[in-house]
Design a protein with these regions (language model features):
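Periplasmic-binding protein-like
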Residues: 491-518
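Short, polar/charged alpha-helical segment
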Residues: 45-68, 168, 172
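Conserved C-terminal helix/tail region of periplasmic/extracytoplasmic solute-binding proteins
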Residues: 500, 513-526, 532-598
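Hinge/lid segment of periplasmic solute-binding proteins
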Residues: 96-166, 172, 188-213, 408, ...
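Glycine-centered hinge/linker elements that transmit conformational signals in sensory
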Residues: 237, 241-248, 283-372, 398-401, ...
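Extracytoplasmic/periplasmic solute-binding protein
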Residues: 143-160, 165, 193-328
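A bilobed periplasmic-binding-protein/Venus flytrap-type ligand-binding module shared by bacterial periplasmic
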Residues: 168-171, 469-482, 502
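Extracytoplasmic "Venus flytrap"/periplasmic binding protein-like
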Residues: 58, 62-141, 176-177, 182, ...
Length: 598
């Protein structure tokens, strides 16, 4: 479904050409002798602009002297694409949402040779694939009439930063429910030290205290337990809906909840992508509209597995195109995962009301706030306890909720030994409860251990992925040809570690994993869990609005998806009957192939 806006970010609109704000950035006294001046257009907020000024000034006084380049920065609030035809800048920031359509118009310079022959300190090694593949698209259409984007395509933009989705949660709400919050990476839960008794869950309940200082409280079943939320491990689907249930004020769920609803989650990507689903699936010739596909997905268990000339490794999720081959794979080499339909159904039930508005829609959980924007105000005002948002929410939260929120990763499909839930009576959501670690169910002690394949030891987990907004640096095709070498020298520096240290000061996740997953980046959060943002960015993907040359194909069905299906006014079957055929036709006519995308 389509992204509905960001509160603040490095964003390009399509509004007033040439509008400017916050002035030029010609700091540092002008170019020195031997420096060639280039123009750099970008968009930034007031606080971000100060950082951009510092970055440009640092380059001009340092690497720029060695390169013989002086950057004249210009903070423009909106840049119309027509401005790239006349009086174009030499370097420009472009978001993923605009990138492909502008690239197809021929508005960018192919940077492949620059990167191959003169990379400087910039290298794609150590940068997540989604960063680099997002801004690769061939200049020409192939002989089959399809233009390739992604892996192996022409480099038309260099990744400058990412703004990933994560969950922002209310500390007062969690305290009200007696939840103990820890921040321990999964690899550090090795059965030793302070958290030796803690299992790798995003949220779990324990019969006995799992660590010194943990406080107990009553759970939804009325039992005294130790509730533990680990903001460095994704919750699985059951944990997320249980926690959302805990924070939904209802006589059937929790009449004492401090919030009206549990969560505000507008995007379904984390559910679908975790099990290998998506709203599109490549069938070998074109794309299918696969948002409600009922075919099984597969997790690879064996060390390696060849499917249709593609090599998969243990822990990989099989692509849509290779699922049929996976179904016939040797016994024990794959593990069946939920279908894309299952993922969609779980997501829709979060916001669809119980009973589905008198049976018109899916019988939902009624635990999620239905909102198109999921504005930070819903967290601040006590409507929800968990908010799905890009890091742009931080600006609003720091203004009106400072010190009262923190950050956690998105959901992930994860399987635990003995399952995750039990029922007290009929198998309805009202009667569903999370299993308590240390309790006995059906004469079996529940340990809460992560499930793994018995033969291979492969953990039974899906992908950890959610969407991100990516920004690139490009050289406009119609810029001064004599200045393109100079423009490239600035780009390669800005995308290297030295330049990315400024990007991360704007809270955007830098392109290099070693820098993103570092104490230097975490420290920028001033105690908040910026690890979650960095972690999420490593496996993030572009949203469906940026898959192809424009988002029009999404507009054909997203209105019904968001306004009817998610709100509980139609079922998945009803949605597919009304919108599926048109969406399938629209996607089958797309002439771009996303190479390397799961």
């Amino acid at each position: 479904m389509r992204k509905l806006g960001k509160l603040t970010a490095i964003v390009l609109g399509t509004l007033l050409a040439g509008s400017m704000a916050f002035g030029l950035v010609g700091c540092g006294g002008g170019p020195q002798e031997g420096q060639t001046t280039i123009r750099f257009w970008y968009t930034a907020s007031i606080s971000e602009n100060r950082i951009m000024q510092d970055m440009i000034d640092d380059y001009n006084k340092g690497q720029g002297i060695e390169d013989g380049v002086y950057v004249d920065g210009d903070n423009r609030q909106n840049i119309e694409r027509t401005a790239l035809y006349v009086d174009t800048p030499d370097v420009l920031t472009v978001t993923d949402e605009n990138f492909k359509s502008w690239a197809i118009e021929g508005l960018f310079t192919d940077l492949s040779d620059y990167y191959a022959n003169d990379p400087g300190d910039y290298t794609e090694e150590g940068i997540p694939e989604a960063y680099t593949q997002t801004f690769r698209i061939d200049k020409e259409v192939g002989e089959n009439g399809i233009r390739m984007a992604g892996e192996g395509a022409d480099l038309q933009g260099v990744p400058f930063g990412a703004d990933p989705m994560a969950y922002y949660y209310s500390l007062p709400a969690f305290e009200d429910q007696g939840i103990n919050i820890i921040s321990v990476a999964e690899e550090d839960l090795d059965g030793t030290g302070t958290y030796a008794k803690v299992q790798p869950h995003g949220y779990a309940e324990y019969k006995e205290s799992p660590f010194e200082g943990a406080v107990s409280s009553a759970n939804l079943a009325g039992d005294t337990v130790y509730k533990v939320f680990n903001n460095r491990i994704p919750m699985n689907w059951e944990e997320f809906r249980y926690l959302s249930k805990m924070f939904t004020r209802s006589s059937a769920y929790n009449p004492d909840s401090p919030t009206t609803y549990g969560s505000g989650t507008h995007w379904w990507f984390a559910y679908a992508w975790s099990v290998g689903g998506d709203c599109i699936g490549w069938n070998g010739e074109n794309y299918d509209f696969s948002v409600a596909d009922e075919g099984a997905n597969y997790l690879v268990l064996s060390d390696t597995l060849e499917l249709n000339d593609k090599t998969y490794y243990a822990g990989d999720i099989v692509s849509y195109q290779d699922r049929a081959a996976a179904a016939d794979a040797p016994e024990g080499s794959v593990h069946e995962l939920p279908s894309t339909y299952d993922a969609l159904y779980e997501f829709v039930r979060l916001s669809s009301p119980v009973g589905g508005n008198g049976g018109r829609g899916e019988n939902g959980y009624g635990i999620g706030l239905f909102s198109n924007d999921n504005a930070a105000g819903s967290l601040v005002n006590g409507e929800i306890a968990l908010l799905a948002s890009s890091e742009s929410a931080i600006t609003s939260l720091e203004t009106s909720y400072r010190g009262k929120y923190d950050i956690a990763p998105a959901q992930q499909w994860r399987e635990y030994e003995g399952g995750s839930v039990y029922y007290d009576g009929a198998e309805t959501f009202e009667n569903e409860y999370l299993k308590v670690i240390g309790e006995t169910y059906d004469d079996v002690l529940y340990t809460g251990e992560l499930a793994a394949d018995e033969a291979t030891g492969t953990p039974l987990v899906g992908r950890t992925s959610a969407f991100a907004g990516f920004t690139s640096l490009v050289i406009p095709a119609r810029s001064d040809a004599s200045l393109k070498d100079a423009a490239w020298k600035f780009i390669r520096w800005a995308a290297s570690e030295e330049g990315q240290r400024y990007v991360m000061q704007m809270s955007d996740v830098p392109n290099q994993t070693s820098l993103a997953m570092s104490d230097d980046y975490y420290a920028i959060g001033s105690g908040k869990n910026y690890w979650a943002l960095a972690f999420q960015a490593q496996t993030a993907e572009i949203g469906d609005w940026a898959y192809f040359e424009n988002g029009e194909w999404v507009n054909d069905w997203s209105g019904s998806f968001n306004g009817q299906l998610r709100a509980g006014y139609t079922t998945i079957e009803g949605f597919m009957e009304s919108d599926g055929a048109a969406a399938d036709r629209a996607i089958s006519e797309v002439d771009i192939y996303l190479n390397g995308r799961f």
